[in-house]
Amino acid sequence: MGRTSRIGSVLFSCIALAVGVTAPPAAATPNAGPGQVSAPQVTWGSCQRFLGDAARDIPTAQCTTVPVPISETDPTGPQAQLAVIKIPATGQRIGALFVNPGGPGASAVDSAAGMSYALAGSPMAEHFDIVGFDPRGVGYSTPAVRCRTDAEFDAWRRNPMVDYSPAGVAAIEQINRGYAKECADKMGAAFLAGVGTDSAAKDMDTVRRVLGDDQINYLGFSYGTELGTAYLEKFPDRVRAMVLDGAIDPAQDTVASILQQMTGFQVVFNDYAADCAKSAGCPLGTDPAHWVDRYHQLVDPLVTKPGPTSDPRGLGYQDALTGTFNALYTPQYWKFLTSGLLGLARQTDAGDLLMLADEYDGRNPYGHYSNGQDAFNAVRCVDSPTPIDPAVWADIDKRTRELAPFQAYGQFTGFAPRDLCAFWPVPPTSAPHPALPAPPGSVVVVSTTHDPATPYEAGVNLARELAAPLITFDGTQHTAVFNGNECIDSAIVNYFVDLTVPGNLTC
């Protein structure tokens, strides 16, 4: 899923686990011809080390780790180990289909395993190895970016962080500085400098060489479109077919991206409220003019007093907004948002909003967090320059209050905290720039008209920059491929299997 760096309440979770990098592997690598780079030598085996007992449900799956140097300038130095899963094609193999679910920070190993279920019996499973690799710092790859303990993350979530007075802003920025320092102390600056999309694109080509394929097929969702675009830019001749769904426009800077994303979330909040209003007892009522006000009447009191839940933690303000954002990614979650808001209205049980927040933040029922939010922060902070002028962030706050009033607490004060990336210990390794035109037929872009996290216009822009066809899905959700729409799915399957490039299409 594409995550939002929400203004006003930093949605960046933290977990602490001191992790070291591994020593370089002693095994020799296969010989390479003149001018070629050797592929690392790996051994494929059981996926239980990544998937646990779930590996038994995919008996043909094979897993391995692929070593890559932490520093490009020190290829024989410390290595990261990339977790890789491969579910072999069931019939005549065309090649490998790399999948990336987005984030950044979501596990592609988990995504590929799940996609193997969804595509079972389809031409995609018949002709392609389904492959997922976790970029460095992410998921099952090691070292995994982890910055705070579970208890520290729980405590962070209890802080509403809505005081935008000068003193309140200074306190929030101190929290952001502390988080950045913890990440640097636990992971090291050298490792953090190499976790961005630029490195991930090069690592994906290393995995391609391990698989022995001349070209890749690629399906990227949300942030996965950014990774795919970066790979296409670096290795255009190594792409057979690529689909980018839920596009991120690489030409957008941080400010433009925030403003566009907040606009998208307000549009979908309105879609949710309109759908909710069709049912008797909708907690937001039936008058569109009052939906935002009613939402604030329900959630703003949580700043000073948590809402009731069966979980002893209760529902804090930050969790209520996080849960709301999570629900807006898909209409399938709207019923949980309604249930949580009804719990606040009736002062009974708002636990469904807490459940949505836990899922978004990667907290399991036992109170342990995945490293998804830490990886999300580590990647985004090096992928693009972050404004450091406080006046820029005050202006962003003013504009997002106008564009997305549902998520804005209180009144504009003229002050706002700088994002934690403004305090990141290493500089960015990439900068916004338009995507380069792609080789004809090598890429297709898919964009959804009411996508909150990756708004439709970003897909239009990316398709234009790549000189690629655009498939438009007329709907309200985040991403669309292999999500039950026959119009889209048949076009995508024909493209991957037969290289039948669709024209511009609306489904």
Predicted regions and their residues:
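Gly/Pro-rich cap/lid or specificity-loop segments adjacent to the active site
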Residues: A32-D319, A378, S384-C507
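Secretory targeting and sorting signals
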Residues: M1-T29, M204
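Short helix-capping/linker segments at secondary-structure and domain boundaries
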Residues: L328-R346, T386-A391
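Structural motif
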Residues: K305-L321, Y329-Y333, Y366-D374
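Flexible "cap/lid" loop of the alpha/beta hydrolase fold
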Residues: I248-Q266, T338-L341, D349-P365
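Long, low-complexity segments enriched in small/aliphatic residues
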Residues: G351-S384, I388-D389, W393-I396
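Short, solvent-exposed helix-helix connector turns and helix-capping sites enriched
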Residues: S279, L344-L353, N485
